[in-house]
Design a protein with these regions (language model features):
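Bacterial lipoprotein signal-peptidase II cleavage site
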Residues: 18-39
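Secondary-structure end/capping motifs
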Residues: 246-325
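Pocket-lining segment of extracytoplasmic ligand-binding domains
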Residues: 112, 143, 182-183, 189-279
């Protein structure tokens, strides 16, 4: 009974909460069929041929700037992949679509949501990432905040215990379930309003609210979640394990294109504001508020160590039933090999274009995935 109650609460929380990297739009059924590519790979340029040349990506309404850039710069075309973005209405809808094979990849559903699905039997593999960090805690300007210990005894607006905040509380010896009162609000805008009205002392918000926060003189950002749990791996890139096993070249080439897009994004952020604003139909000031923020950081890296830490913390906090966890080796659901192959090839082919970027990606992988 306890297990069923926890599962229902978690399902409700995921259904109504916005994703870590922004909300999602309406869900369209996938209509195209993947095209099996049977061309001979022994061509003049000796290019690899993807096993499947059409990828369906579950798209949140905040978009994925790396996918947009990879399309516009022709990186997907160069490796023979066509990425179709299919709108999904929520984190739960995105992961259910992935489970059903309606989409091939999702990237805007945080880390805890795909891990929750894995814990209940979904055979997903985390193969990369989108946002590394970018979420934050807000409070009224006159609310005294020193560090995570200031949250003890507070009223916190979120849909249940926030996993990253919960991890930080556990590290500080504070029981996240009993020492903080969690108030459930279904959207980021509702959580923001709860703090402004005084119903809640704090709230966790994502990048899509940075413009609103910056233009509200009653509140301020108290802490970035990365200050509490460094490199917590905000949004992971998820695929069905069976798809990854059958199409390793496709996945590697997809990651390779995204790594190149990440380099271009970091070198051209101002231009990316215009590109993404046009792509999602938003004002440039709104997009600039998060895309140009130094704390809003992308990374295609799988961040294996952070994923494992989040998994362990979710078990401690009751998000994942211990009996379910005992049946699963979470490392079997984190594929770092294909990302490493993609990164190695990028370094070999494009290192001279931006040595600092590629050296940094290699160092980051060594520190966060081994």
């Amino acid at each position: 009974m306890k297990k069923r109650i926890i599962s229902l609460l978690l399902a409700a929380a995921m259904t109504f909460s916005l994703t870590a990297c922004g909300g999602n739009s309406s869900d369209d059924k996938k209509e195209e069929t993947k095209t099996e590519n049977t061309e001979n790979t022994d061509n003049k340029e000796n290019k690899e041929t993807p096993e499947v040349d059409t990828i369906h990506w579950g798209r949140a309404n905040s978009g994925n700037i790396l996918v947009t850039i990879a399309k516009q710069q022709g990186y997907f075309d160069e490796v023979g992949i066509n990425v179709i973005e299919d709108p999904v209405e929520s984190s739960t809808a995105a992961l259910q679509a992935l489970q059903a094979g309606q989409v091939d990849v999702t990237s805007n559903q945080g880390t805890n949501n795909p891990l929750q699905f894995i814990s209940t039997g979904s055979d997903f593999s985390i193969v990369g990432g989108y946002m590394l960090k970018g979420m934050y805690i807000i409070g009224k300007k006159d609310t005294q905040y020193k560090d995570v210990t200031s949250l003890k005894g507070s009223k916190f607006a979120y849909a249940g215990v926030h996993p990253v905040v919960g991890m930080a509380l556990l590290d500080a010896g504070i029981d996240p379930n009993n020492d903080v009162e969690w108030l459930t609000y279904s959207t980021n805008s509702d959580r923001l309003a709860a703090v402004v009205s005084g119903e809640a002392d704090y709230a966790v918000l994502s990048g899509d609210q940075l413009y609103a926060v910056g233009n509200n003189d009653q509140i301020e950002i108290k802490a970035w979640l990365d200050d509490l749990v460094p490199n917590y791996g905000c949004c992971r890139m998820n695929m069905n394990t069976d798809f990854v096993k059958k199409n390793p070249t496709t996945v590697k080439l997809l990651l390779k294109s995204l790594i190149r897009a990440e380099q271009w994004y970091l070198a051209n952020k101002e231009e990316c504001v215009k590109i993404l604003a046009k792509e999602i139909g938003a004002e440039e000031d709104y997009v600039a508020a998060y895309l140009l923020n130094d704390n809003y950081v992308s990374s295609v890296d799988p961040c294996k160590n952070s994923v494992v830490k989040t998994w362990d913390a979710m078990i401690k906090m009751g998000f994942i039933d211990q009996e379910d966890a005992d049946k699963i080796n979470i490392e079997d659901h984190i594929n770092t090999e294909l990302y490493k192959e993609a990164l190695d090839e990028c370094v070999a082919e494009y290192h001279d274009e931006d040595p600092d970027f590629y050296d940094g990606r290699v160092k980051f992988f060594e520190e966060n995935d081994q």
